[in-house]
């Protein structure tokens, strides 16, 4: 039965109120994605004459089938979002039913194309990207960000979260960096990673211009002056794509780069350099060998040579 306007308002009010309980337990990006997923689900139910909460197994299956144009990862996340709201509202949860699992498996099997992976910013690309940075404060910051992100195999959110306090300048001109929190480390136990001498030099040059008195390692620059706040993680994506474009790469290649490219490219380079899986997992903070394998799929590494 289609809920009326009053019921829809009550549903929206109830779930959004309960949803706030998740704050602090999940990353902000995950919260935003779940929130958008539930909005989509509620609107779909309204248009389909169905009740969203509690949703029946039939309703959730029908919703998932309607979402089959999206990537399986997106559909799976929407299942998790629906599950979480049912749990928060103390309602019977339909998402553990076997029919839900079978519906998702059908959607996943219907996808014949391989999941798209960000183009790796390998060392050869890194060298090109560093070479096209301007000779000004923005260039100092950009070079330090690109080189540090590559050496630490960071996600973009990890890179912009680093503080000056997290960086130890070593006598051999390298850096020891504490990455405090990551997507797979919500508890914030952190991991330690190391850099090359080149990265140590680039970070030092950036800080000598900016000063050591700000907490964020990387910060915005406004009218030639550093601003004491962290950069948005979208800055990393824009930086990499802009560097690829300025380096004269093919537009299709430019489009394939993303904020994840540093992590992908560095992992591929470590594989080609002969490092074993355990060493690569430690360097990048991977907990799952299956996830790492996805990163290494496109590495140009011929084991027969």
Model-based region annotation:
Residues 284-305:
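Catalytic-site neighborhood detector that most strongly recognizes the C-terminal catalytic loop/helix
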Residues 170-226, 239-243, 247:
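Basic, alpha-helical nucleic-acid-contacting "clamp/cap" segments
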Residues 124-156:
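Basic, Lys/Arg- and aromatic-enriched nucleic-acid-binding interface segment
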Residues 149-173, 282:
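Short, charged phosphate-coordinating catalytic segments
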Residues 109-128, 186-198, 212-217, 229-234:
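DNA breakage-rejoining catalytic core of tyrosine-based enzymes
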Residues 212-213, 237-264, 268-282, 301:
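Short, basic (Lys/Arg/His-rich) helix/loop patches that form interaction surfaces
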Residues 126, 141-143, 233, 237, ...:
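Short, leucine-enriched amphipathic alpha-helices that occur as contiguous helical runs
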Residues 15-31, 38-116, 132-135:
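N-terminal core-binding DNA-recognition domain of tyrosine recombinases/integrases
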């Amino acid at each position: 039965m289609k809920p009326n306007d009053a019921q829809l308002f009550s549903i929206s009010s109830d779930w959004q109120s309960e949803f706030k309980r998740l704050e602090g337990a999940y990353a902000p990006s995950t919260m935003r994605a779940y929130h958008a997923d539930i909005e989509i689900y509620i609107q779909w139910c309204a248009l389909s004459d169905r009740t969203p909460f509690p949703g029946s197994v039939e309703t959730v299956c029908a919703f998932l089938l309607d979402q089959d144009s999206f990537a399986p990862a997106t559909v799976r996340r929407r299942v998790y979002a629906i599950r979480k709201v049912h749990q928060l509202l103390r309602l019977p949860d339909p998402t553990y039913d076997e029919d839900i699992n079978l519906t998702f498996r059908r959607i996943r099997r219907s996808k014949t194309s391989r999941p798209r992976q960000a183009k790796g910013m390998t060392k050869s690309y890194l060298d090109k990207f560093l070479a096209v940075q301007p000779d000004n404060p923005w260039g100092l910051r950009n070079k330090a960000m690109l080189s540090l992100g590559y050496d630490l195999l960071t996600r973009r959110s990890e890179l912009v979260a680093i503080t000056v306090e997290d960086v130890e300048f070593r006598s051999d001109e390298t850096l020891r960096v504490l990455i405090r929190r990551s997507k797979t480390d919500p508890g914030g136990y952190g991991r330690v990673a190391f850099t090359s001498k080149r990265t140590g030099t680039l970070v030092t040059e950036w800080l000598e211009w900016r000063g050591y008195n700000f907490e964020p390692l990387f910060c915005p620059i406004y009218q030639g002056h550093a601003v004491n706040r962290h950069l948005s993680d979208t800055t990393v994506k824009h930086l990499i794509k802009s560097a690829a474009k300025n380096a004269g790469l093919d537009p299709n290649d430019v489009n394939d780069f993303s904020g994840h490219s540093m992590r992908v490219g560095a992992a591929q380079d470590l594989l080609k350099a002969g490092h074993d899986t355990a060493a690569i997992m430690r360097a990048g903070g991977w907990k799952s060998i299956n996830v790492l394998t996805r990163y290494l799929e496109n590495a140009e590494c011929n084991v027969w040579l």
